[in-house]
């Protein structure tokens, strides 16, 4: 959950805050490419059960889904009598405990706000008043009443939660709290005037300014922090924030209260009162700011906003893009000095009436997008993982906060560079009266969302217009208040208590889809989030001319702190005139798309979990199973010594009377014959069912192997080769030599490093060494085709390094505890070891065995 920042709050009307039940203190960033990380704001409260995202606000929930209606006043269904009642009551206790903790924080905040009121009143009648009585009453209007209401509520609820049993009732307390919301109505009506008065008094009186800038808020009873400093402006916002939160808690309580429980009707009544209160407030004014209007005089609403990478003058810039009902505005956040309000600077805008999407033919004429070198992106990822590990170590050792902040700043800088340089999917828009613009996205899902949102608005009767400088200034100024996305999507912006995501391998079987109205050629792609952004990880085969495709294809997807899985369903385009030559320009039609959260408790079970995701009337059935990175380190020897998978390489070569296992030779031969120019060869996942079929054929030494290989998808063959090396009882470069490889690659002196690395190769058993050299030369030949297949030596080292070289189970348990640690400590070195040999001139088995110093260059 994103904490509420108390610094630099914008001057908002009370309705602004009701619409924006989330953080206003966004992290500052320089859209030209230089970010500055800031620490978490002081005085922010943590609520363990409430999501503060905009969608949790009654009004924002409806808006974020594109509808115009707020949440229905009908309360959520409670638990049926006797149905999981025990579990529901336990959840009810957890909800109440969380609410009680946040209520304590809220009361402490109200106390801090009231603390200066008495001395201010005392000086008001003296010859040198700080504030007048009228000013004091305006600023602190109804705060005392709100405090007393919540103190009484807290004092009555606390013992009930502390002495919990299944028969405890507290619905009457919430009913009474809801019945006193009239006090909040009076506070809300006065809120804008209170803020303006406080600001004017701060400007005219230094003494009051000092008081209002640092009010001391007591920490919770169990907190280590005795006090935190918060501004008066931030504390005056708290009652506004609390109104919507209390309503959300009632939803949660009803959800986990049996319908036959005595509290159920009381909670229903409290929810009805609360929702009617919110509705009455919302009806008092226009649901959007009247200051931002369209040329026709209608209210201009913000529909969507987010951070996108724009190609501007051949360089990448991070922009905050705002889609209003009639205009698309591209902005960057200005750098501001401490204490000043943040502002956006408009880079350009296009009225939606003038906005068009270029055709594939027009896009083809546009400049090609040159992707950032993959090896540099991989280096950034490894640095980020290493920094995460260092931060965790510092926290575990109770290190200095300054050291942690420095590490966080470094991590933010690397994450920002990764976010800026990784997107490659073009999103082109054109102003029919002039210039074209190009954004780069990492996800086709995201591109589709932007395109669909714009096209939906363009169906309305829109008029072209030109904004005056004043109108543009007003519109740009409104962006800060209206935005729904506050922080750049990097993991360093997450709170410590947020889930770090999953590390390991997600096995997904895409079974089938239903709901298509007419036959089409259909396929699915899978996307997962990694390092704060989404990337495409797998693609099913095309199922032709059908309304009910049955793929039943399995994929293994590596997760790196992932929290969500997206599935996109496409209709394949076979019209060559519509196919764009730009590899990143996907022109197939998206039929539907959907997203699910990767809940660790659901996916980490050993069994397959089957689910259905609905998208535009289409239902896609899939199953998934997760293997943690810790578990993936384990190598299981084959029980049958007649096969090749899971059998020692020396046993296989001796049985076959060959120097290199037959499976390695055949897979490499097939890849070089028809897959060496395949984009993403070895990086793109093959279909898991095809890989398992090939595994079974090789294990059985079936005579039809060659025929099957010639008919099989090349990515499945590449995947089979990777699987063979991964399932060896010990890695190809052996458990015994693993620590020595780690030490050798870390040497600084080139001569010492080469001597050590060649000595280590000599130390390998002959079957392992010969197979390694055979694979090495193959990977070099693949990399020679990098301009076509996009697979550099570094990419190949990233794919194969952790497979050929891994710590033994004993060693990984002895030194490392978490999946993230395993990644950051080992993978970088594993990749570097293989990359060293790939970049080395050809290595001769015969020369190695002469047992002499082996220098490739004068060092």
UniProtKB/Swiss-Prot annotation:
InterPro entries: Abr/Bcr, ABR_PH, C2_dom, C2_domain_sf, DBL_dom_sf, DH_dom, GDS_CDC24_CS, PH-like_dom_sf. Residues 54-64 have a biased composition (Polar residues). SUPFAM superfamilies: C2 domain (Calcium/lipid-binding domain, CaLB) (SSF49562), DBL homology domain (DH-domain) (SSF48065), GTPase activation domain, GAP (SSF48350), PH domain-like (SSF50729). One of its GO terms (biological process) is establishment of localization in cell. Residues 31-84 are annotated as: Disordered. It is found in: Cell projection, Dendritic spine; Cell projection, Axon; Synapse. Residues 484-613 form the C2 domain. Residues 647-845 form the Rho-GAP domain. GO terms for molecular function: GTPase activator activity; guanyl-nucleotide exchange factor activity. GO terms for cellular component: axon; cytosol; dendritic spine; glutamatergic synapse; membrane; plasma membrane; postsynaptic density, intracellular component; Schaffer collateral - CA1 synapse. Residues 301-459 form the PH domain. Keywords: Cell projection, Coiled coil, GTPase activation, Guanine-nucleotide releasing factor, Phosphoprotein, Synapse. The modification Phosphoserine is found at residue 57. The record marks 683 as: Arginine finger. Expressed in brain, including the cortex, hippocampus, cerebellum, and brainstem, as well as the spinal cord (at protein level). Pfam families: C2, PH_19, RhoGAP, RhoGEF. Residues 91-284 form the DH domain. Its main location: other. The central Dbl homology (DH) domain functions as a guanine nucleotide exchange factor (GEF) that modulates the GTPases CDC42, RHOA and RAC1. Promotes the conversion of CDC42, RHOA and RAC1 from the GDP-bound to the GTP-bound form. The C-terminus is a Rho-GAP domain which stimulates GTP hydrolysis by RAC1, RAC2 and CDC42. The protein has a unique structure having two opposing regulatory activities toward small GTP-binding proteins. Protein with a unique structure having two opposing regulatory activities toward small GTP-binding proteins. The C-terminus is a GTPase-activating protein domain which stimulates GTP hydrolysis by RAC1, RAC2 and CDC42. Accelerates the intrinsic rate of GTP hydrolysis of RAC1 or CDC42, leading to down-regulation of the active GTP-bound form. The central Dbl homology (DH) domain functions as guanine nucleotide exchange factor (GEF) that modulates the GTPases CDC42, RHOA and RAC1. Promotes the conversion of CDC42, RHOA and RAC1 from the GDP-bound to the GTP-bound form. Interacts with DLG4. This is Active breakpoint cluster region-related protein. It comes from Rattus norvegicus.
């Amino acid at each position: 959950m994103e904490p509420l920042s108390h610094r630099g709050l914008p001057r908002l009307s009370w309705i602004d805050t009701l619409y924006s039940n989330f953080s206003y203190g966004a992290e500052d960033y320089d859209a030209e490419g230089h970010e500055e990380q800031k620490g978490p704001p002081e005085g922010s409260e943590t609520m363990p059960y409430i999501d503060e995202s905009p969608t949790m606000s009654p009004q924002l929930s409806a808006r974020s889904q594109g509808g115009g209606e707020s949440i229905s006043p009908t309360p959520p269904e409670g638990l049926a009598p006797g149905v999981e009642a025990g579990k529901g009551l336990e959840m009810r206790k957890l909800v109440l405990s969380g609410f009680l903790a946040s209520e304590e924080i809220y009361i402490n905040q109200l106390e801090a706000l009231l603390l200066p009121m008495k001395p201010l009143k005392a000086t008001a009648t003296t010859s040198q008043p700080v504030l007048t009585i009228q000013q004091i009453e305006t600023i602190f209007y109804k705060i005392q009443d709100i405090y007393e209401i919540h103190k009484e509520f807290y004092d009555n609820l606390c013992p009930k939660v502390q002495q919990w049993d299944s028969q405890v009732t507290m619905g009457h307390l919430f009913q009474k709290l809801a019945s006193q919301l009239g006090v909040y109505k009076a506070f809300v009506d006065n809120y804008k005037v209170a803020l303006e008065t406080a600001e004017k008094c701060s400007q005219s009186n230094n003494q009051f300014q000092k008081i209002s800038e640092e009010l001391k808020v007591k920490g919770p009873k169990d907190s280590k922090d005795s006090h935190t400093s918060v501004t008066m402006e931030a504390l005056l916002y708290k009652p506004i924030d609390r109104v919507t939160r209390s309503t959300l808690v009632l939803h949660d309580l009803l959800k986990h209260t049996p319908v036959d429980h005595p509290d159920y009707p009381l909670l229903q009544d409290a929810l009805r009162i609360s929702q009617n209160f919110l509705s009455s407030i919302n009806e008092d004014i226009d649901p959007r700011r009247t200051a931002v209007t369209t040329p026709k005089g209608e209210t201009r609403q913000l529909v969507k906003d987010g951070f996108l990478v724009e190609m501007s003058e051949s360089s990448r810039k991070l922009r905050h893009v705002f889609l209003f009902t009639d205009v698309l505005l591209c902005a960057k956040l200005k750098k501001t000095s401490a204490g000043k309000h943040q502002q956006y600077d408009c880079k350009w805008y296009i009225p939606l009436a003038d906005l068009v999407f270029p055709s594939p033919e027009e896009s083809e004429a546009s400049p090609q997008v040159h992707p950032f070198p993959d090896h540099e992106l991989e280096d950034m990822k490894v640095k980020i993982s290493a920094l995460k590990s260092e931060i965790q170590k510092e926290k575990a050792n109770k290190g200095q906060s300054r050291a942690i902040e420095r590490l966080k700043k470094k991590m933010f800088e690397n994450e920002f560079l990764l976010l800026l340089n990784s997107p490659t999917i073009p999103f082109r828009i054109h102003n029919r009266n002039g210039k074209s613009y190009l954004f780069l996205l990492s996800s086709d899902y995201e591109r589709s969302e932007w395109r669909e949102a714009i096209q939906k608005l363009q169906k309305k009767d829109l008029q072209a217009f030109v904004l005056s400088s004043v109108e543009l200034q007003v519109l740009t100024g409104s962006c800060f208040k209206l935005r729904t996305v506050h922080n750049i999507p990097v993991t360093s912006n997450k709170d410590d208590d947020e889930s770090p995501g999953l590390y390991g391998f997600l096995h997904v079987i895409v079974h089938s889809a239903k709901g298509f109205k007419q036959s089409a050629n259909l396929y699915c792609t899978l996307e997962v989030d990694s390092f704060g952004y989404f990337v495409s990880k797998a693609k099913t085969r095309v199922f032709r001319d059908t309304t009910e495709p049955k793929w039943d294809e399995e994929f293994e997807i590596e997760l790196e702190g992932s929290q969500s899985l997206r599935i996109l369903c496409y209709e394949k385009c076979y019209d060559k005139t519509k196919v764009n030559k730009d590899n990143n320009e996907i022109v197939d039609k998206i039929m539907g798309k959907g997203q699910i959260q990767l809940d660790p408790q659901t996916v980490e079970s050993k069994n397959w979990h089957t689910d259905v995701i609905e998208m535009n009337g289409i239902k896609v059935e899939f199953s998934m199973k997760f293997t943690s990175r810790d578990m993936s380190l384990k190598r299981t020897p084959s029980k049958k010594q007649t096969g090749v998978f899971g059998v020692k390489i020396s046993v296989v070569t001796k049985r076959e009377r060959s120097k290199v296992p037959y499976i390695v030779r055949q897979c490499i031969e097939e890849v070089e014959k028809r897959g060496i120019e395949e984009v993403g060869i070895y990086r793109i996942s093959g279909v898991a069912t095809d890989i398992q079929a090939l595994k079974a054929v090789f294990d059985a030494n079936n005579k039809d192997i060659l025929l099957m290989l010639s008919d099989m998808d090349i990515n499945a063959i590449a995947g089979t080769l990777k699987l063979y090396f991964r399932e060896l009882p010990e890695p190809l470069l052996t458990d015994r030599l693993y620590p020595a490889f780690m030490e050798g690659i870390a040497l600084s002196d080139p001569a010492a490093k080469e001597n050590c690395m060649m000595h280590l190769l000599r130390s390998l058993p002959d079957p392992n060494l010969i197979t390694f050299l055979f694979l090495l030369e193959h990977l070099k030949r693949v990399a020679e085709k990098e301009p076509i297949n996009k697979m550099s030596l570094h990419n190949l080292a990233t794919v194969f390094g952790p497979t050929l070289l891994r710590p033994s189970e004993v060693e990984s348990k002895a030194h490392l505890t978490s999946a993230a640690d395993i990644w950051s400590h080992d993978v970088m070195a594993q990749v570097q070891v293989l990359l060293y040999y790939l970049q080395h001139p050809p290595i001769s088995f015969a020369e190695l065995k002469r047992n002499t110093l082996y220098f490739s260059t004068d060092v």
